[in-house]
Curated annotation (Swiss-Prot):
It is found in: Cytoplasm. Disulfide bonds: none annotated. One of the essential components for the initiation of protein synthesis. Stabilizes the binding of IF-2 and IF-3 on the 30S subunit to which N-formylmethionyl-tRNA(fMet) subsequently binds. Helps modulate mRNA selection, yielding the 30S pre-initiation complex (PIC). Upon addition of the 50S ribosomal subunit IF-1, IF-2 and IF-3 are released leaving the mature 70S translation initiation complex. Keywords: Cytoplasm, Initiation factor, Protein biosynthesis, RNA-binding, rRNA-binding. This is Translation initiation factor IF-1 1. The gene is infA1. The keyword Ligase does not apply. The lineage of its organism: Bacteria, Pseudomonadati, Pseudomonadota, Betaproteobacteria, Rhodocyclales. The keyword Cytoplasm applies.
Amino acid sequence: MAKEELIEMSGMVVEVLPDSRFRVTLDNGHNLVAYSAGKMRKHHIRILCGDKVSLELSPYDLSKGRITFRHLEGRGPLGPQRRRR
């Protein structure tokens, strides 16, 4: 049996919730609760309020999603860069 197609959307994080979940407002105005993907947790990618993110939604439950990518546009500098030896 083939896996169902996931719906790709983009939105903005409006609230950080406990248990690494986030309230996200999609570009079309809908609100949903999303969690960060396992690879994002593995590589310690931090998601903050106001970040633009890409999400995957299941066609069966459109109120929950998985954050798969964080866009860096509009963010300030990340801090001083360390020199490698």
